Amino acid sequence: MTTHRPLFYGSITALITPMDNHGEVDFNALKKLVEYHIASGTHAIVSVGTTGESATLSIAENVKTILKTLEFADGRIPVIAGTGANATSEAITMTKLLNDSGVAGCLSVVPYYNKPTQEGMYQHFKAIAECTDIPQILYNVPSRTGSDLLPETVGRLAQISNIIGIKEATGDVSRVAKIKQAAGDDFIFLSGDDATGLESMKLGGQGVISVTNNIAAADMAKMCELALAGKFDEAEIINDKLSALHKDLFIESNPIPVKWAAYKLGLIPEPILRLPLTTLSEQSQPKVIEALKNAGLL
């Protein structure tokens, strides 16, 4: 049971970035999404992370989207900026542009494609942390990056004062204990895997950076509140209801299914993505509809 809440905790949305028919960011739709999350009890927003299609937005578009999200949030919900890149210099540039913005934290992914060593990862995150006072959250997602940030490297990075936590998206719940042992109990552990998010909280994690939250925000917030209060049996009831969503929102590459689901629920006007991502295929749509019905959303 969590009695003292850390800087980041609970149900944190990995927010989709709505786009119009021309493939441009739809800021009117973005404002409505921010209001939806505030009304639903979401604990924080990650702007332009993986689910927010950061990889296909320019630096200028990323920064503008983060700043507009901050504007729409208006201090009512913390905003965490996705600032990761596989070039350390680019990640530093993004971070510096936000130094005086008011973001509550930065989420920085393990460099993808170039496959650095553990020492390379350490030096990468150290260099980013040294360019800012903004709290930094590491982001480990080997299925996308091709590299695994190991617990012992996390422990080294935890010695840097403004590296305060990790989004751990391996789905390996044993990482909770390993990272806590290496980095200390105060180091924030946020699951990046909806399917194992509640289990990680049972083992000492403080929350979930969630894809499911985009369309089931109130349920995810309630589940995490119950888990933080140690009411795991009640939290499990909600998690069971959402279990098909946790799985089928990854039936195709994220954020393809969740954007289509948000469109189906009327949360965004179009399910548009930027190439090379394309809209959810017709053969996958029935599975997502079934999962939405199981969750009581349709």
UniProtKB/Swiss-Prot annotation:
Disulfide bonds: none annotated. Pyruvate binds at residues 51, 209. Keywords: Amino-acid biosynthesis, Cytoplasm, Diaminopimelate biosynthesis, Lyase, Lysine biosynthesis, Schiff base. Its main location: cytoplasm. Pfam families: DHDPS. It catalyses: L-aspartate 4-semialdehyde + pyruvate = (2S,4S)-4-hydroxy-2,3,4,5-tetrahydrodipicolinate + H2O + H(+). Its EC number is 4.3.3.7. Pathway: Amino-acid biosynthesis; L-lysine biosynthesis via DAP pathway; (S)-tetrahydrodipicolinate from L-aspartate: step 3/4. GO terms for biological process: diaminopimelate biosynthetic process; lysine biosynthetic process via diaminopimelate. The active site is at residues 139, 167. PROSITE patterns: DHDPS_1, DHDPS_2. One of its GO terms (cellular component) is cytosol. The record marks 50, 113 as: Part of a proton relay during catalysis. It is found in: Cytoplasm. GO terms for molecular function: 4-hydroxy-tetrahydrodipicolinate synthase activity. Homotetramer; dimer of dimers. HAMAP family: DapA (MF_00418). Catalyzes the condensation of (S)-aspartate-beta-semialdehyde [(S)-ASA] and pyruvate to 4-hydroxy-tetrahydrodipicolinate (HTPA). NCBIfam families: dapA (TIGR00674). Belongs to the DapA family. This is 4-hydroxy-tetrahydrodipicolinate synthase. It comes from Histophilus somni (strain 2336) (Haemophilus somnus).
